[in-house]
C-alpha cells in the first residue's frame, strides 16, 4: 500500500490510534454492557429495554429516554434479535481484548438463543416473547428478524468454530431461503403472512441485506463443504438481487423498499445514507469474497459518492454544547465536518454514523487516502456519542441505549473496524483473540478483511474454551 495521504488542512488533527480504540471498547462501551443488569435472568437472556443508567425498564415509572411513542408500544416484548445483537457485542469485546468474562457472556447468549428461542415446531427463530410465550404466527415473522437471530451466533462461530453453532447456522439459513424465497426469484420475502403491521406485499432491502451482514458474509468462508459452496452461491444471488432490483444507478443509491413508488422516495423509511452506505459496503465485501471485480468497482464509486453526500459542516454554535473541552480546543475556528442522515436533513442516529465511518475507513485502507471527515467523525463518536458516565452509545448522543431496535451491535462493530483500520494505517500488527486451539486455527482472517497471519500464540483456557492470540499483518479489505 502507498503512503498515507493526510489532507493539509487536517495536519493539526489526529486519528485515534489502536490503543485508543481498545480503550474506547473497554472503558467507553463495555461498562454499560457489562453491568449486572445487562446480563439477564438467567444469564444470557439479555433484556431488551434498559435505561441510560443501566436500570431495567420499570413500566410504572418509565425513564424519559425510553418514553417515546414509537418505543412504549413494544414494552412487554423481549426481542430475539436484540439478544443476538448483544451476544455479537460480547464476542467482539472478547475478540479485541481477550476478556474471558465477555467470552462467557457471548456463550451464555448463544446458549439461550439456541435452547430457548428456536421454534422447535415450525423451524426458524421466535421473533419475540411476551409474558414468556412466543409472539406471532411463524409466517408473520420477518426475514430480517430471522437473520438477526443469527448475528450473535455467527460471531461466536467465527471465534470458536463450535460444531453445535455450525449446525444451527446451517439449519436456519436453509429455513430462511426455503421458506422466504420469492416465486419470481426477486429475492426474499419480508413476511409470509400479514400481521403485526407488516404486509406480505412488502419488498424490503433489509430482507436481503441483513442476511448478508447478519451471517452469510462472515460464516460462508469458514464452513465445510458442501455448505461453503452453497452459502457462497446464495451470497452471490442475494448481492445480485440487491443490485438488480433495489439499486438505482441513476440516483446512485439503494431503495429501502420497492413495493410501491412512495416507499422508493428519498424521504421514505430506509432511504437514508445509512442503508445505502451499508449496502455499498456489503456489495464491496461480497465482491471481494466472490472475486467479482465489477461489484467492487461499483461499490467503491458508490461509497465515495455517498460519503460526499452525507458529510456537511454544521454551525459551531449548534454543536459546541456537545463538544468536550479537549476537542473544543482542537477544533475552535475550524470548519468541523459531520455526518447526516439524508439530503437536507442534518439529523442522524449513531448506527448510521457508524456505518458511514466504517465505509470511509474501508476506502482509506484501499487507497491510503484518509478523508478529512474522519478526523472529526471518529473522535466525535468516541467523545460525543459515548455516555461518559455509564458507558455505551445510544440512538441519540449518550442516550436511548437499549430498546427494541438499538443496543450494542453497531457500536462494537464500529470499534472493531476502527481498531483494524488504525493498526493497518500505522503499519502495526493487528492482535485479535479467538476461542479455539492452535490445531483449529485455519482460515483465520480479521473480520471481513484479508491479512497475513504473523503469529499464533496459545493462552490459558477461558470460560471452558481454549484461547489463542493471533497477530495479523498487511490487512486489506
PLM region spans:
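Glycan-recognition and catalytic cores of secretory/periplasmic carbohydrate-active enzymes
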Residues: 5-477
Amino acid at each position: 500500500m502507498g503512503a498515507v495521504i493526510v489532507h493539509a488542512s487536517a495536519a493539526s488533527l489526529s486519528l485515534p490510534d489502536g490503543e485508543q480504540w481498545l480503550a474506547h471498547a473497554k472503558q467507553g462501551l463495555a461498562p454499560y454492557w457489562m453491568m449486572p443488569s445487562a446480563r439477564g435472568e438467567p444469564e444470557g437472556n439479555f433484556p431488551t429495554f434498559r435505561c441510560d443508567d443501566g436500570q431495567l425498564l420499570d413500566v410504572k415509572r418509565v425513564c424519559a429516554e425510553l418514553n417515546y411513542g414509537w418505543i412504549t408500544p413494544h414494552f412487554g416484548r423481549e426481542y430475539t434479535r436484540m439478544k443476538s445483537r448483544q451476544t455479537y457485542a460480547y464476542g467482539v469485546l472478547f475478540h479485541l481484548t481477550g476478556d474471558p468474562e465477555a467470552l462467557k457472556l457471548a456463550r451464555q447468549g448463544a446458549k439461550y438463543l439456541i435452547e430457548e428461542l428456536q421454534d422447535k415446531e415450525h423451524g426458524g427463530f421466535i421473533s419475540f416473547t411476551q409474558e414468556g410465550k412466543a409472539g406471532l404466527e411463524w409466517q408473520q415473522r420477518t426475514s430480517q428478524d430471522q437473520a438477526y437471530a443469527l448475528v450473535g451466533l455467527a460471531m461466536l462461530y467465527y471465534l470458536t468454530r463450535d460444531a453445535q453453532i455450525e449446525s444451527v447456522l446451517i439449519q436456519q439459513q436453509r429455513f430462511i431461503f426455503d421458506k422466504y424465497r420469492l416465486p419470481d426469484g426477486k429475492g426474499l420475502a419480508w413476511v409470509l403472512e400479514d400481521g403485526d403491521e407488516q404486509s406480505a406485499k412488502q419488498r424490503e432491502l433489509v430482507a436481503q441485506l441483513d442476511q448478508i451482514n447478519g451471517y452469510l458474509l462472515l460464516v460462508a468462508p469458514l464452513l465445510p463443504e458442501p455448505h461453503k459452496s452453497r452459502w457462497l452461491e446464495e451470497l452471490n444471488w442475494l448481492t445480485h438481487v440487491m443490485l438488480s432490483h433495489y439499486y438505482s444507478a441513476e440516483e446512485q443509491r439503494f431503495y429501502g423498499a420497492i413495493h410501491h413508488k412512495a416507499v422508493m422516495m428519498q424521504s421514505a423509511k430506509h432511504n437514508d445514507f445509512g442503508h445505502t452506505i451499508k449496502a455499498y459496503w456489503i456489495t464491496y465485501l461480497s465482491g471481494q469474497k466472490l472475486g467479482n471485480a465489477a461489484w467492487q468497482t461499483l461499490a467503491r464509486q458508490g461509497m465515495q459518492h455517498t460519503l460526499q453526500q452525507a458529510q456537511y459542516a454544521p454551525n459551531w454554535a449548534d454543536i459546541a454544547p456537545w463538544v468536550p473541552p479537549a476537542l473544543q480546543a482542537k477544533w475552535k475556528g475550524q470548519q468541523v465536518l459531520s455526518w447526516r442522515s439524508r439530503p437536507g436533513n442534518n439529523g442522524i442516529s449513531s448506527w448510521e454514523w457508524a456505518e458511514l465511518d466504517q465505509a470511509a475507513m474501508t476506502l482509506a485502507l484501499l487507497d491510503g487516502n484518509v478523508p478529512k471527515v474522519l478526523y472529526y467523525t471518529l473522535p466525535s463518536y468516541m467523545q460525543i456519542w459515548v455516555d461518559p458516565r455509564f458507558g455505551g452509545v445510544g440512538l441519540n448522543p449518550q442516550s436511548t441505549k437499549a430498546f427494541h431496535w438499538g443496543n450494542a451491535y453497531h457500536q462494537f462493530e464500529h470499534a472493531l473496524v476502527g481498531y483494524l483500520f488504525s493498526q493497518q494505517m500505522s503499519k502495526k500488527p493487528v492482535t485479535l483473540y479467538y476461542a479455539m486451539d492452535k490445531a483449529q486455527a485455519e482460515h483465520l482472517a480479521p473480520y471481513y478483511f484479508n491479512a497475513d497471519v504473523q503469529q499464533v500464540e496459545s493462552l490459558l483456557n477461558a470460560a471452558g474454551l481454549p484461547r489463542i492470540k493471533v497477530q495479523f499483518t498487511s490487512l486489506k479489505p
